[in-house]
Amino acid sequence: MKIGTSAMSPSKTHFTTIDEYIQSFPPMVQERLHQLRQTIKDVAPDAEEAIKYQMPTFVLYGNLVYFAAWKRHISLYPITAEMEASLQELADYTTSGKGTVQFPNDRPLPLPLIRTIVACRVRENRANKEKAT
């Protein structure tokens, strides 16, 4: 399966908005995706929404976070090595060496952890932008 094409998503694989992406899933998954989206917006209200790699993306000082729904979980990208080393709560979830954390659909979304991840990404992106200038 190519990157960004979610396992649960119907045949449409070219989304132009996050709303289109979310609406392509069953109601239970839509609810979780709306909750994730709102949590990201609460932490990074100035981030712009986009679709990149056919995934919902938030952009602030560069790409901030992406998310995708799959058959058994929702993935959030990227999780940096620094986060994996310092955020104890990540140990409760499947992570990959490619900067992904998976939140199983049979458990509530860990909103405090998601807030922390997004806040870390905002700080990282801001610092990277300041280094570049």
Regions found by a protein language model. Name each.
Residues 1-133:
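Charge-dense, helix-prone N-terminal extensions
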